[in-house]
């Protein structure tokens, strides 16, 4: 069902393609948001106090919906009418995807494809376009999809500000638009789907690490890239927790999600400071690389956070790490398909559609370990009941 499409570079996309991008620019040194030894630096321009307060409250909220289907659950639902989008028959669903450039997105997309297969009686065609992590390509992709007679458009934006005009153009074309995973700076989509969010993720990890560190200890913060709302808000919340705990943040570095670069950064800080007492990460894809850097240097692995990637969970168990795994569940990739079909049925959906965001701790770690699945698989896939499990994810 997956179809590869080539983005058009025609005159019709020139207006949007001319927008400035908030993609990170390449830097030989991986310039960070705070220079080494300068603490957490200034608060991110993405920080919104009310959103921060709301997300922290949502961490303790009880969801509505089927108890065994967290991808259908909603936290504090705010229902919106979708009657104007009701259409009979089977539907053509189009998906503009930021990228398939890391294991989290790859696992998520496999989950989405399986959800489409499970809904094949209601979906006539599923069109997927991979923007390859490029803002300008995704802008062109969305413009192209507007001419493909899609019944609904799903968007996972590469970056927040730059993709906003393209999403607004899709809304103006009359398409029901569903945004998920990463947000945009407009309220025009029918719904925005994601778990609790970046503030919740960042807070959980930073609170744990700062509490497990020795007082006044040195912490290294590892980030992936700037300009993506869910990553910026993770750092915003972590900054608040780390500042409050008076942690000595000796560096904030961007890894580009590259294990080799991560190892080099961690090793450089070990060489510079001798001891690093805590590691906070805005995503767990390179958590194993960070652990290995300490092991290679003959240093104890300090308290840290990772994510629900199985290689990290196994290492945590085997090496008895002091760790926590806030999650951004890949089961959220099922929800946009479910939402799009509900909208085309004229059924109310929540906007925003906030999904539960579980945390893996030492107490529940064993529940999420699965030796039968690949190391880069994510425990929160919510995919066990889908067609092709487990082979599709191996």
Tell me what each language-model feature is:
Residues 14-18:
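C-terminal motif of bacterial Sec signal peptides marking the signal peptidase cleavage site
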